[in-house]
Regions:
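Nucleotide donor/acceptor-binding cores
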Residues: 13-17
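Flexible gly/pro-rich beta->alpha loop and the following alpha-helix that scaffold active-site loops
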Residues: 47-100
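Short helix-loop-beta junction
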Residues: 35-46
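Short, small-residue-biased leader/transition segments that mark boundaries at the very start
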Residues: 2-3
Length: 211
């Protein structure tokens, strides 16, 4: 719950409106129950958006939100649904008007130009995302054994020129489109900018705060 409190604090509102979007799991019910269990403990107004049940009026709901919180799951399927409903453009408008955009896994990479995803069962892939924030992002950097070698491979193949690589139990706070700092809520976890220098991967850790 520590990082969720941190997300709420970024709104600078006493009682922020926060909206959970669990599209990447097909609007999984237990995910929504967990969300409300956590956020009803805090001083906020939690809501959510379904796309696989009857969907609320997005054009009126999104502009009212101080924070958007996106769950993990299948990034490719999530973005396809959002585009079909026009949510991508509504979120862009909200972002440009100062709404805090946040999320985990698929909900973290979706804001960037590109993300490293396991949406396809057979392999990791670099996929285009919303492009609100410059850069390429990889979650689960230390949690899933295939992640670090894949980042090294796509760097060496010149498919990407850097990767904002985020370990488990860590968040990357992006401020004004620029990575601001890592937020560690685990045991000595960090986020890195991985680049290729003289043929070898260099991982530069971001400045970090510990919660």
């Amino acid at each position: 719950d520590v990082y969720k409190r941190q997300i709420l604090s970024l709104s600078n509102k006493e009682k922020p409106n926060i909206c959970f979007i669990p599209t990447a799991t097909g609007d999984n019910d237990s995910y929504k129950v967990n969300y409300y269990d956590v956020f009803t403990k805090f001083n906020c107004n939690p809501t959510h958006i379904d796309f696989f049940k009857r969907t609320i009026d997005l054009s009126s709901h999104i502009p009212e939100q101080d924070i958007i919180f996106v769950g993990g799951g299948n990034t490719k399927s999530m973005l396809a649904v959002w585009k079909d409903w026009g949510l991508d453009e509504l979120l862009r408008d909200a972002y440009e008007n100062g709404t805090v955009m946040s999320g985990v896994s698929a909900g973290a990479i979706c804001w960037f130009e590109k993300g490293i995803t396991d949406s396809w069962a057979h392999d990791l892939a670099v996929m285009d995302c919303l492009g609100f924030v410059n850069g390429i992002c990889c979650p689960h950097y230390d949690e899933e054994p295939a992640r670090r070698p894949f980042v090294e491979k796509v760097l060496k193949d010149n498919l990407i020129d850097h990767c904002l690589s985020v370990e488990g139990n860590c968040a990357l706070h992006v401020k004004n489109d620029i990575p601001h700092r890592a937020i560690n809520f685990g045991k000595n976890k960090n986020s890195y900018n991985a680049t290729l220098v003289n043929g070898e991967v260099l991982e530069e850790a971001f400045e970090r705060i510990d919660l």
